[in-house]
C-alpha cells in the first residue's frame, strides 16, 4: 500500500466522501475575568498559559463550587472571534458530569442576558446559550458562534468542578492580507482594519452573512463583502464557491434566496468578479444560468423600461416598509443587473 496518510486504513468508498476543511484553529487565553459569583477559588490561574492537555492529577486548579449556590464567572477574550471554547476539567464531584451553562456574547450584556423577550439576546441559528455536562479528565470543545465574552455557570447543585484551563478556539481561513490602508488618522486606520477583520471572520468555506447568525449564503449581502475581499484578500476561492453554491441551490425560474433582487445582485457580482479575476473558464461555466436569468429578468420590464417584478421585491431592512423607496431601489438594481448581463454577452 503506497498511501502514507491517515486514510490508508479506510476503503475507497469512504475516502471518496472525504471533504477537507481548509480552515485552521488556534487557542486563545482569556485576557481578564470580568465578573464572578459564588464560591470560586484560584480563578486567576485561567489567565495563565498552560499545556493544553489534561492530566491525571489536579494541581493549581480553579475550583467552582455550588454548595452555597450557583458558581459563575465571566471571561473576556479580548477580541471578537469565530469559534467556541475548550474546557479542560480535571474532575467533578458527581462522577457523571456536572451540569453547566455556557453563554457566549459579543458584549458583556449579551453574555449575561437570558434569551427571548423584548431587548434580550436571541439563541437562534448559531447557538450562543448552551447547557451541557463537564466530566472528569475531559477536554471538549463547546460552541460555534461569534463572541468575545463567555459566561460559565455551574448549575449542578452541591457540586464542585476542578478546571485546568478555558481557552477560546478561533476557527478561521488562513488568507493573507494582500491589500492595506494607511493614513495619518490612527482611528481611521483601526476602522479599516476592523472592517477587513469582520469580513475575514465571515470568509469560512463559504461567505456567510454573519458568524453568529443563520450562516446562509445571502447573495445580495455578498456584494459589499466581495468588494472588500477583492480589495484585501484578492481572488479568494470562497467567492466563486459561494456563487456556485447559490446557483446550484436555485434552479430557474426560482429567485435566489427567494428574492428577485438577489438574483439581480448575483448577475452584478458575477460580472464584477470576472472583470477583476479574468477567470474565463469559470465565467463560461455560468453561461447557461446567466442566459436563463437574463431572459427571466427581461420578462419583468415593461415597454417603458419599468421594473415589474412582483416576487421578492427587497432592497434592505430599513426601507422594507417604504414601498416607494423599495420600488426605486429595485429599479436601480435591475438596471445595474441588466447592464452587467449586457456587458457579459457582448
Outline where the language-model segments fall.
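Charged, long alpha-helical assembly modules
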Residues: 257, 261-281, 289-292
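Extended, well-ordered alpha-helical scaffold segments
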Residues: 191-194, 235-246, 280-297, 341, ...
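Extracellular/oxidizing-compartment recognition motifs
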Residues: 1-205, 220-221, 234-243, 281, ...
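Amphipathic, well-ordered alpha-helical segments in soluble domains
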Residues: 221, 235-238, 242, 262-269, ...
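The feature captures the catalytic groove of carbohydrate-active enzymes
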Residues: 113-119, 123-125, 249-265, 280, ...
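C-terminal catalytic domain of Rieske-type non-heme iron oxygenases
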Residues: 219-222, 246-249, 315
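Alpha-helix capping and helix-loop boundary segments enriched in small/acidic/polar residues
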Residues: 138-141, 182-186, 213-216, 230, ...
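Short glycine/serine- and small hydrophobic-enriched flexible loop segments
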Residues: 227-231, 268-275, 336-346
Amino acid at each position: 500500500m503506497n498511501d502514507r496518510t491517515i486514510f490508508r486504513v479506510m476503503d475507497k468508498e469512504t475516502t471518496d466522501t472525504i471533504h477537507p476543511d481548509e480552515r485552521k484553529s488556534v487557542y486563545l487565553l482569556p485576557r481578564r475575568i470580568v465578573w464572578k459569583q459564588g464560591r470560586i477559588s484560584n480563578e486567576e490561574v485561567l489567565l495563565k498559559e498552560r499545556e493544553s492537555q489534561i492530566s491525571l492529577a489536579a494541581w493549581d486548579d480553579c475550583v467552582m463550587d455550588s454548595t452555597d449556590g450557583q458558581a459563575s464567572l465571566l471571561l473576556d477574550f479580548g477580541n471578537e472571534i469565530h469559534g467556541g471554547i475548550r474546557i479542560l476539567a480535571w474532575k467533578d464531584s458527581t462522577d457523571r458530569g456536572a451540569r453547566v451553562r455556557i453563554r457566549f456574547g459579543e458584549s458583556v450584556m449579551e453574555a449575561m442576558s437570558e434569551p427571548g423577550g423584548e431587548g434580550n439576546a436571541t439563541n437562534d441559528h448559531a447557538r450562543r446559550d448552551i447547557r451541557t455536562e463537564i466530566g472528569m479528565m475531559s477536554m471538549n470543545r463547546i460552541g460555534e458562534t461569534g463572541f468575545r465574552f463567555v459566561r460559565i455557570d455551574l448549575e449542578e447543585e452541591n457540586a464542585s468542578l476542578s478546571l485546568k484551563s478555558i481557552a477560546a478556539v478561533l476557527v478561521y481561513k488562513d488568507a493573507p492580507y494582500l491589500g492595506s490602508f494607511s493614513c495619518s488618522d490612527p482611528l481611521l486606520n483601526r476602522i479599516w482594519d476592523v472592517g477587513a477583520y469582520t469580513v475575514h471572520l465571515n470568509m469560512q468555506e463559504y461567505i456567510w452573512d454573519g458568524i453568529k447568525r443563520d450562516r446562509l449564503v445571502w447573495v445580495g449581502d455578498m456584494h459589499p463583502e466581495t468588494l472588500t475581499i477583492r480589495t484585501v484578500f484578492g481572488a479568494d476561492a470562497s467567492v466563486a464557491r459561494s456563487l456556485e453554491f447559490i446557483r446550484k441551490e436555485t434552479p430557474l425560474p426560482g429567485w435566489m434566496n427567494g428574492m428577485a433582487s438577489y438574483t439581480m445582485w448575483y448577475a452584478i457580482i458575477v460580472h464584477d468578479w470576472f472583470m477583476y479575476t479574468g477567470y474565463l473558464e469559470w465565467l463560461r461555466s455560468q453561461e447557461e444560468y446567466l442566459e436563463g436569468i437574463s431572459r427571466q429578468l427581461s420578462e419583468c420590464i415593461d415597454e417603458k423600461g419599468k421594473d415589474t417584478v412582483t416576487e421578492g421585491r427587497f432592497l434592505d431592512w430599513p426601507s422594507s416598509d417604504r414601498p416607494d423607496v423599495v420600488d426605486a431601489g429595485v429599479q436601480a438594481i435591475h438596471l445595474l443587473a441588466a447592464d452587467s448581463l449586457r456587458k457579459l454577452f457582448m
